[in-house]
UniProtKB/Swiss-Prot annotation:
One of its GO terms (molecular function) is structural constituent of ribosome. This is one of the proteins that binds to the 5S RNA in the ribosome where it forms part of the central protuberance. Belongs to the bacterial ribosomal protein bL25 family. CTC subfamily. GO terms for cellular component: cytosolic large ribosomal subunit. One of its GO terms (biological process) is translation. It comes from Sulfurimonas denitrificans (strain ATCC 33889 / DSM 1251). Part of the 50S ribosomal subunit; part of the 5S rRNA/L5/L18/L25 subcomplex. Contacts the 5S rRNA. Binds to the 5S rRNA independently of L5 and L18. It comes from the Bacteria. Keywords: Ribonucleoprotein, Ribosomal protein, RNA-binding, rRNA-binding. The lineage of its organism: Bacteria, Pseudomonadati, Campylobacterota, Epsilonproteobacteria, Campylobacterales. InterPro entries: Rbsml_bL25/Gln-tRNA_synth_N, Ribosomal_bL25/Gln-tRNA_synth, Ribosomal_bL25_b-dom, Ribosomal_bL25_C, Ribosomal_bL25_long, Ribosomal_L25_dom, Ribosomal_uL5_bac-type. Pfam families: Ribosomal_L25p, Ribosomal_TL5_C. This is Large ribosomal subunit protein bL25.
Length: 178
């Protein structure tokens, strides 16, 4: 379980001091809940997020335990180092928006014809309860050749889950390698 601290000072000076000490700044919020200004050790946070098996993961801040989902993050434009993360509390039986990762399944025909799979939308926005939200959206690419694309409307519907991205948005395509 990822453990964090409550930030006493939310100003620029306090934020810089926490970052210098190796902390990642986080805001934790949820429907009907008080916002929490927290900080986590950056290395522990990255290890937890990379190794999680579900969309939500447990955290402990100020003796409060909760399951959260990463809603947004901010990275430094040059170094790519994480600066800030927004975590939403995954409340049971509350319908809200989540960003679910897209995973490909199979080998595309186009890969044998000197093509590459280009995932233009690595996460799809869905509206559902946390219990009904899948951990990932699997897209079968076995019949895709160079020039083919899968759009949101081509993805199989999931029970009690609504895709909020437009139907005409391209999720992935097989492009010709240069």
């Amino acid at each position: 379980m990822l453990e964090g601290i409550i930030r006493e000072s939310i100003g620029k000076k306090g934020t810089k001091a926490l970052r210098r000490d190796g902390y990642l700044i986080a805001n934790i919020y949820g429907k009907g809940l008080q916002n929490l200004h927290a900080a986590f050790k950056e290395n522990e946070y990255i290890r937890t997020v990379r190794n999680k098996e579900t969309l939500s993961f447990p955290i402990k801040v100020d003796s409060k335990e909760m399951n959260v989902v990463v809603q947004a993050y901010e990275a430094h434009p040059v170094t790519g180092k994480l600066l800030h993360v927004d975590l939403m509390v995954a409340q049971p039986n509350v319908v809200t928006h989540y960003h679910v990762p897209v995973v490909t399944e199979g080998d595309a025909i186009g890969l044998k014809n000197k093509g590459l799979i280009h995932i233009s939308k690595p996460r799809l926005r869905v509206k559902a309860t946390i219990e009904n939200t899948p951990n990932s959206i699997v897209v079968d690419v076995t019949k895709m050749d160079v020039g083919d694309a899968k759009m949101v409307r081509d993805i199989a519907k999931i029970a009690n889950v609504t895709f909020t991205d437009a139907d005409r948005v391209s999720v992935l395509s097989v492009i010709k390698a240069k």
